[in-house]
Amino acid sequence: MPPDSVHFNGSVNLPGTEAVMREISSRVPRGVRRMTDGETGERYYWIMFQVQKFAAMADFQAAGTRELPGVDLPPMPLLRLADGVAAKNVRWPDLGYAAAYTDSYQVFRRLQDDGTIPAGVRFQMQYPTPVAPIAGTFVPEDTEGLVASYQAALFADLDRALASLPHEQVAVQWDVAVEFAMLEGGFGFDPVPLGQITPGLARCADQIPGDVPVGMHLCYGDAGHQHFKQPESLALQVQVANAVTAAARRPVNWFSFTVPQAQRDNDYFAPLATLRTGPQTELYFALVPYYPASQPAGTTAQQAAHIDTHLGKSLAGSRDWGICTECGMGRVQAGDVPTLLDLHRTILDTHEVNR
């Protein structure tokens, strides 16, 4: 089955929410089930605005810097709890997500009311997992306690957003990136077992009410517009999807998978045969290349064929699936965003004849 739908993983390098939604709606007129606000403004570089908030807090103090091996970025600030401060007593500021999404939803509602955004498309909110802004930002001895403390603040922010927005019109995506760095030993982390990661991801899924769809972006990072490592296959991503599906008390409605744009080897996609998500779980694969001019002709068709072959062997068997980019489009040059959006439509149109 060729791809039939499109997913946007979050950030889009355009001037603001309305520009993002209008460009997506005009350039990708079909296949969009959820509309991102582009994570514009202070959210443009994912969790960096959270780290900036932490650095200004009296409850923390500087502890040097931390290198990010494998990416072309300057050292990141490293923090620790200030003397006499316990993690459970940290006074977290307004994290900013609920306010941003409440504002963006008003734009979404207006554009859907006037027909720019099709009826039935949901407003998508993206949140980092609680681990993401904490692990790597704080010294290891403070991390566990701070993840629990920050989780309470992040979930409270999410609850405020959900309380202010109509559940029948929204969806939530959790961005699972730092966990993959921890599993793979990237960004200088010591590798951890999957069992250490799964409970936290299941908590994230279960935090979303049952009447709101929830998804997970399985991500290998985009710091400096590059992955912390090139995944060797879909094996680990499939393992994470299976583990979260089994551990969560509610269904996970979609997963988006990282596929490097040059990757066309059968072995990369073979682990899909072991996928144990249900038939109603939407699956999206990064077949929209950031650099289309450098991708050999026929790559997308080969990737699609491998996906179909191995999904056909999985527990739920052959099913419809969709496309996305490897991460968001926040690090893409603004002038290239329209081209990438057009490419989403082109891939759907090109493969439609095979449906």
Model-derived segments and spans:
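N-terminal basic, low-complexity leaders that serve as flexible interaction/assembly modules and, when applicable
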Residues: M1-D72, D349-T350
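Acidic, His- and aromatic-enriched active-site or binding-groove loops in soluble protein domains
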Residues: D59-F60, E144-F155, F189-I208, L234-T245
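Active-site beta-loop-alpha junctions enriched in small/polar residues
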Residues: S11, P128-A132, D175-E179, C219-A223, ...
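Structural preference for beta-strand elements that scaffold enzyme active sites
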Residues: P2-N9, G31-M35, G120-Q126, Q169-Q173, ...
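A contiguous, surface-oriented mixed alpha/beta subdomain in the mid-to-C-terminal portion of proteins
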Residues: G200-Y284
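Catalytic-face loop-and-helix region of soluble metabolic enzyme cores
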Residues: A246-R355
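Active-site-proximal, glycine-rich beta->alpha crossover segments in alpha/beta enzymes
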Residues: D72-P166, A171-Q196
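Acidic (Asp/Glu)-rich catalytic clusters
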Residues: S25-S26, F108-R122, L162-Q169, P199-D211, ...
